[in-house]
Amino acid sequence: MFEDAASNPVKTLNISGKTRLCFIVGDPIAQVKSPASVSQAFHDAGLDALCVPAHVTPADLAGWIEHMSKAKNVDGLIATVPHKFACFAHCATASDRAVFLGAVNTMRRNQDGTWHGDMFDGMGYVEALTSKGCNPEGQRALIVGAGGAGSAIAYSLMTAGVAELAIHDEDHVRRDSLAGRLAGLNLGKVSIGSPDPRGFGIVINATPLGMKPDDLHPVVSGHFTSDQFVGCVITVPAVPPMIGVARAKGCNTMTGADMFARVCDLMVQFLIGAS
């Protein structure tokens, strides 16, 4: 249903039948910030293109992609929770890291109209970490969540040189699968983690926990110490409860918005064919 947008009036609309489209698909979708940021980036690059949100449930995703792909003016697709693994199955080609992870967050058209996918969550997260003064190399890291974003971040932490990566996820099958594949890279120690953050230099929440006011903290935040770096992938609220506790304890932190800014840059470069 249409909602009142009086508090956010549109100043200028330059849309025509020539405008190219990129969808961002998720369930839920109301929390995403990509439509405005990606659309602005298209404009800044001199492109007549828009990023449009689509709320699609997992049960409907395959049919939606099938029909959406028939639209000749759709050039790209951004996948968010929970569709990053499912969207990989719709890619005819993909980057090596996407193949390793079995997940994508961005898709663009091949010359024959099929989809080529890549995953930038991990690369963007580690670049954002570094910009915040946190060098992963040689550190012990705990990541909570082995979903699409968590898997990508875990992979990039390993390739960035962490000494040990502990993975915690309530879905033990998913957790163990990721741990096994990462261990096969022979880049560092991979272990099974828990919600206890003690002993880790880097602690990252890569789950949706914290989006709702009554969510439990993904880790035992009372155990944070001021020498830890604590990060989160959540963009709404701006300061998730876990991050609030970490800051109160003197930890350096990074929010989902910090990650999103870098991931957005990488996605746009991919979508416009600059990478």
What do the predicted segments below correspond to?
Residues 15-16, 136-137, 161, 219-228:
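Short, conserved loop/helix-junction motifs that constitute active-site signature segments
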Residues 26, 119, 129, 134, ...:
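Glycine-rich adenosine-cofactor-binding loop
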Residues 100-106, 209, 223-260:
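ADP-ribose/adenylate-binding Rossmann-like module
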